[in-house]
Amino acid sequence: MKNTVLAAFSGILLATTAVVYAGDKGQEIYDSKCKVCHETGAAGAPKMGDKDAWAPRIAAGTDSLMNSVINGKNAMPPKGTCMDCSDDDLKAAMEYMTSKSQ
């Protein structure tokens, strides 16, 4: 019984740590790469936190957003200049931004 409880607790702890890490990674990438445009709306970028600007993008779905992030869109270059970011890194940044814009 103790082993079962310990295993369950360990699993929950690991899952929680992974979620926190993903959020931190998303914010880290946003702060270092995305913020320069998405905080001010430079070059037509939707400002983070602008629910009206983000609503149609969020409604289009994660695949559509990731396509824009990876390939670029309008004035946004591919990967938003984060050429060393993996797709998972970019997804973490996108999720961070959309979570603050709903």
Model-derived regions: residue spans:
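Bacterial N-terminal signal peptides that target proteins for export
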Residues: 1-8
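Bacterial N-terminal signal peptides
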Residues: 8-16
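Processing junctions and N-termini across compartments
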Residues: 16, 28-31, 79
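Sec/Tat signal peptide C-region and signal peptidase I cleavage site
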Residues: 17-23
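Local sequence-structure signature of Cys/Sec-based thiol-disulfide redox active-site neighborhoods
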Residues: 23-33, 43
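The canonical Cys-X-X-Cys-His
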Residues: 33-40, 93, 97
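Gly/Gly-Pro-rich "capping" loops immediately C-terminal to redox-active cysteine motifs
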Residues: 39-67
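Axial heme c-ligation environment in periplasmic c-type cytochrome domains
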Residues: 46-47, 55, 67-92, 96-101
